[in-house]
Regions:
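Glycine-rich phosphate-binding loops of nucleotide-dependent enzymes
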Residues: 2-247
Length: 247
């Protein structure tokens, strides 16, 4: 990994809220992560880029405690997360919005929204504020989760973690399979959350989308970070990204 991991960005003076050092992870006997190092500062949007199978999702799940077999260090506000339960990590204000969205098809939008408990100490986002971010949801409260479009399901998945009170959000491929107009709306929402002081770790293959909102990037390949750089360096990294992402 290059020195760009610590390059000065607008959020560079902010405190580091998440620090991952030497993170290794396994699924059964399959060794997936091979010493991942990354950091996220308060109020930043940081994006993990990489092809399918690079280890991006496993990195998020390892931070959240979903992957059982791990080694290395993951600290959140200087508190070690490895060894803590998923519930305990969530109570610290950390939330994961999974790629598969995990919307319950037989429950209404309202039931899905209120299903996870308010668990973070920071206090939940009000439903009124959620509906200003996602006005479509306020019009579909009684609709079944399975009747929502892909974009509406993604909005509901993000809204659900906001209502828990989490302030550190991990979003896994939030634009996957969505129409361009919905992708733009998701981008505006992430930018608004950043303005409100949320810290976001984003997994994306669509670096053109990420370029509009991310402060810094970490590029993964074969379970390792191979490069890290600030948004301002993106034009000079295009050749590397084309090779690393296959686009």
């Amino acid at each position: 990994m290059t020195e760009a991991a610590h390059v000065q960005t607008p959020a560079a003076a902010a405190a580091t809220v998440l620090k991952v050092e030497g993170l290794q992870a396994w699924y059964n006997e399959s060794h997936i992560l091979h010493g991942v190092d990354l950091d996220v500062r308060e109020g930043e949007v940081v994006t993990l880029l990489g092809r399918n199978g690079a280890g991006k999702t496993t990195t998020l799940k390892s931070i959240m405690g979903i992957v059982g077999k791990r080694s290395g260090s993951v600290t959140f506000h200087d508190r070690e997360l490895i060894g803590l339960s998923i519930d305990r990590i969530a109570r610290l204000g950390v939330a994961l919005c999974p790629e598969e969205r995990a919307i319950f098809a037989t429950l209404s939008v309202k039931e899905n929204l209120f299903l996870p408990p308010e668990i973070a100490r920071t206090g939940a986002m009000s439903v009124e504020r959620i509906f200003t971010l996602f006005p479509n949801l306020s019009e579909r409260l009684s609709s079944g989760g399975g009747k929502l479009s892909g974009g509406e399901q993604q909005m509901l998945a993000i809204a659900r973690i906001l209502r828990t009170g989490a302030r550190f959000l991990m979003l896994d491929e939030p634009t996957e399979g969505l129409a361009p107009v919905i992708i733009q709306q998701i981008g505006r929402t992430i930018a608004e959350l950043k303005r409100e002081g949320f810290t976001i770790l984003l997994v994306e293959q669509n670096f053109r989308f990420a370029a509009t909102i991310a402060d810094r990037f970490f590029v993964m390949e074969h379970g390792r970070i191979i490069d890290a750089f600030a948004n301002s360096e993106l034009p000079g990294k295009m050749d590397m990204l084309h090779e690393a992402l296959g686009v």
